[in-house]
Swiss-Prot record:
PANTHER family: FORMATE-DEPENDENT PHOSPHORIBOSYLGLYCINAMIDE FORMYLTRANSFERASE (PTHR43055:SF1). The gene is purT. N(1)-(5-phospho-beta-D-ribosyl)glycinamide binds at residues 22-23, 82, 286, 356, 363-364. Belongs to the PurK/PurT family. Transmembrane segments: none annotated. It holds the Pfam family PurT_C. Mg(2+) binds at residues 267, 279. It comes from Pseudomonas aeruginosa (strain ATCC 15692 / DSM 22644 / CIP 104116 / JCM 14847 / LMG 12228 / 1C / PRS 101 / PAO1). This is Formate-dependent phosphoribosylglycinamide formyltransferase.
Length: 393
């Protein structure tokens, strides 16, 4: 039986977010709608989720002692990681001491880097993946590329949003790809994965919810990546019944192995009826932002319900829908957005402006959402809305 108290009172149900970006912001809002007290933690101040949380803390998320100090101070009922780069060994310790980590500390630890989850999927679960090789040194990396063959992809074992990721078409790309991966890694100390290139038709995110009554799948989400970073997503992605069934089989296997309750973003490659496992996030997925307009319960609402042990009797997909990212390039601590009336002038459109405190280089600062009669029409409408937004640095 789920019981939720009153925020800021002795009966409060406290949820602590480890990471406070745009996905965490939506999770915080959904948890507050259900009466939770939300504490947001991240490495920089005024992060999006902090702007809607009851309280916030700024610490290095990779500093285990600092993370433990905040958690022991706040005594949350649920610890909810929103990013990969966290001191996961500390989460494992805290879970052993009786804290609840969503979905589990092991899931956070295995998915913190590409090696843990790839070895689980391919070697323990026997799921289909691309050929791969892990390397710590340039020489080992070169051997790995020779073994996997061209074209191939090299990525730091720890990075997000495509940082440090590149495609190698031949030996001339070896050094540049290695150097870029070394710059893009967050905390993997130079280790990389070399992956064989799968000639897929499309890639999907299958949002998979492990909740009190079992496992439920959202309709598949198609997406377009630029240099490994999401720019556009849509739901539903058209696919054969056989490919969908295989996608659900793979997603169920990997999420069952990770355990716990919550929403997972399972990334898959699809060619015809064949499916390969790519990656999994044990939390809402950026491509799933489309669910803010495509479903009656967004991925964030589903995550909140699953965390709190509430039922999810049905997930209604509302028709062809799309999201298009609002990217900002430049340097500013006072970004403003104009021409919003034009961006929202068409029916069935919406915007989310994330409220990130600064941009230095290129940063995802918002997303446009749209529904229409077909996926092509929804994508075009979302793109028009995103492009209509005028950014002032």
């Amino acid at each position: 039986m789920t019981r939720i108290g009153t925020p800021l009172s002795p009966s409060a149900t406290r949820v602590l977010l480890c990471g406070s970006g745009e996905l965490g912001k939506e999770v915080a809002i959904e948890l507050q709608r259900l009466g939770c007290e939300v504490i947001a933690v991240d490495r920089y101040g005024n992060a999006p989720a902090m702007q809607v949380a009851h309280r916030s803390h700024v610490i290095s998320m990779l500093d285990g002692a600092a993370l433990r100090a905040v958690i022991e101070q706040e005594k949350p009922h649920y610890i909810v990681p929103e990013i990969e780069a966290i001191a996961t060994a500390t989460l494992v310790e805290l879970e052993a001491e009786g804290y609840t980590v969503v979905p589990t500390a092991r899931a956070a630890q295995l998915t913190m880097n590409r090696e843990g989850i790839r070895r689980l999927a391919a070697e323990e679960l026997g799921l289909p993946t691309s050929p791969y090789h892990f390397a710590d040194t340039f020489e080992d990396y070169r051997r790995g590329v020779e073994r996997v063959g061209y074209p191939c992809v090299v990525k730091p074992i720890m990075s997000s949003s495509g940082k440090g990721q590149s495609v190698l078409k031949g030996p001339d790309d070896l050094q540049a790809a290695w150097d870029y991966a070394q710059e893009g890694g967050r905390a993997g100390k130079g280790r990389v994965i070399v992956e064989g290139f799968i000639d897929f038709d499309y890639e999907i995110t299958l949002l998979t919810v492990r909740h009190v009554d079992g496992t439920t799948f959202c309709a598949p989400i198609g997406h377009r990546q630029v240099k490994g970073d999401y720019h556009e997503s849509w739901q539903p992605q058209a696919m054969s019944a056989q490919a969908l069934a295989e996608s659900e089989r793979v997603a169920r296997a990997v999420t069952e192995a990770l355990g716990g309750r919550g929403l997972f973003g399972v990334e898959l490659f699809v060619k015809g009826d064949q499916v390969w496992f790519s990656e999994v996030s044990p939390r809402p997925h950026d491509t799933g932002l489309v669910t803010l307009i495509s479903q009656d319960l967004s991925e964030f609402a589903l995550h909140a319900r699953a965390i709190l042990g509430l039922p999810i009797p049905v997930i209604r997909q509302l028709g062809p829908s799309a999201s298009a990212v609002i990217l900002v390039e430049g340097k500013s601590r006072q970004v403003a957005f104009a021409n919003l009336g034009a961006a929202l002038s068409e029916a069935d459109t919406a915007l989310r402006l994330f409220g990130k405190p600064e941009v230095d280089g290129q940063r995802r600062m918002g997303v446009a959402l749209a529904r229409d009669e077909s996926i092509d029409a929804a994508r075009a409408k979302a793109t028009r809305a995103a492009q209509a937004v005028r950014v002032e640095l």
